[in-house]
């Protein structure tokens, strides 16, 4: 399962990975908002944005679910509803980062159980989606207690 119409955006600053992830998700959901408005809404700082600040998007009438201890199985139901999942990770062992380790946010847009692959949009890079094995993905996600966020339109949940 892959959200094929998901449009990739690259982060504008080294510290705005969460802002870029939210921008991608909101554009995918057809929520009219500018990058500058997202920066303000998330209370982004020059050193980064706390992952939990995604909760401030509820002021826009959106639903925001932020949880810890997620599993790869949580992705499928959200993706089936057309909802990408933002995950909080550390890039430990992620080959496309060439052994650089940093705290980061990426968007999960697909999962392939048969081949044990996760497809992500990593806003630090210009190309997407990037595929990671379950094992590689989980090492980085575990570092952040498998935290994830799902942003949705209120009518999707009614």
What are the roles of these predicted feature ranges?
Residues 55-83:
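Helix-adjacent hinge/juxtasegments
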């Amino acid at each position: 399962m892959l959200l094929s119409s998901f449009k990739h955006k690259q982060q504008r600053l080294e510290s705005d990975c969460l802002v870029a992830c939210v921008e991608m998700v909101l554009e995918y959901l057809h929520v009219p908002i500018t990058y500058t408005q997202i920066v303000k809404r998330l209370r982004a700082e020059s050193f980064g944005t706390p992952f939990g600040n995604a909760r401030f998007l509820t002021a826009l009438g959106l639903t925001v679910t932020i949880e810890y201890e997620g599993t790869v199985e949580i992705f499928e139901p959200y993706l089936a509803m057309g909802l990408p999942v933002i995950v909080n990770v550390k890039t430990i062992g992620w080959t496309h980062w060439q052994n650089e380790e940093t705290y980061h946010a990426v968007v999960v847009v697909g999962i392939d159980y048969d081949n044990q692959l996760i497809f992500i949009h990593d806003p630090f890079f210009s190309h997407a989606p990037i595929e990671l094995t379950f094992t590689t993905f989980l090492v980085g996600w575990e570092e952040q207690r498998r935290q994830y966020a799902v942003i949705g339109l209120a009518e999707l949940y009614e």
